[in-house]
Amino acid sequence: MSLSQFIFIDMKNILKYKDYREYMQDVYNERKRTSVFSWREFSALAGFTSPIYMKLVCEGKSSLSKTKMGRVAQSLGLEGYEREYFEQM
């Protein structure tokens, strides 16, 4: 499962972002705005066991390795140039 099945109407295009943390936070905020969503669910979608791992990343208290970056990109449903851009941020 990934977040790609959800339509994010108020999201900026990923190319407008310079920081993956800001993009992840906006995805979380938009998903939370339109339904019940939690950091636990966001972390689980990316395959992390810590329920607050994604929150820690967005707050700058933890970083994503290249491997983890790929897992997050997949959970966000990013493909092609969007995935490449995300992984280079």
Where is each model-derived feature located?
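Residue-level signal for the short linker/turn that defines the boundary of a DNA-recognition helix
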Residues: 36-38, 49, 67
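DNA major-groove recognition helix of helix-turn-helix
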Residues: 28, 57-58, 68
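A short, Lys/Arg-rich alpha-helix, primarily the initiator
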Residues: 2-40
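Short amphipathic recognition helices of helix-turn-helix/homeodomain-type DNA-binding modules
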Residues: 13-14, 76, 80-89
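Short, basic alpha-helical nucleic acid-contact segments in DNA-binding proteins
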Residues: 64-65, 79
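Residues within the helices of the helix-turn-helix
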Residues: 40-41, 70
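Hydrophobic micro-packing sites on short alpha-helices
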Residues: 68-76
